Amino acid sequence: MKGKSLTAQLKKASSASASTVADRLVTLRSERGFSQARLAELAGVDRKTINRIENGHFSPSLDTLTRLSVVLKCRLSDLVEAKRTKR
């Protein structure tokens, strides 16, 4: 892309990814009636980790995303892809 450095492009993509995961995790957790503490307990992670993910301050590892998807009974892609709106 002309005019933008690779570093700027990567930073923008990373920020968008963190925002998507944050939004999806909040939505899925709420839909299933879990508190941050309960989700963290079941997934074997710290509650602060859930909070940091949901606030977009932490990019979870693949292992953490997998644990969350198992507990939330969803596909991994449900956590990392923006929800599509129906037309």
Task: Outline where the language-model segments fall.
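Helix-turn-helix DNA-binding elements, focusing on the entry/boundary residues of the two helices
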Residues: 25, 36, 47, 62-65
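Alpha-helical residues within the helix-turn-helix
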Residues: 30, 41, 70
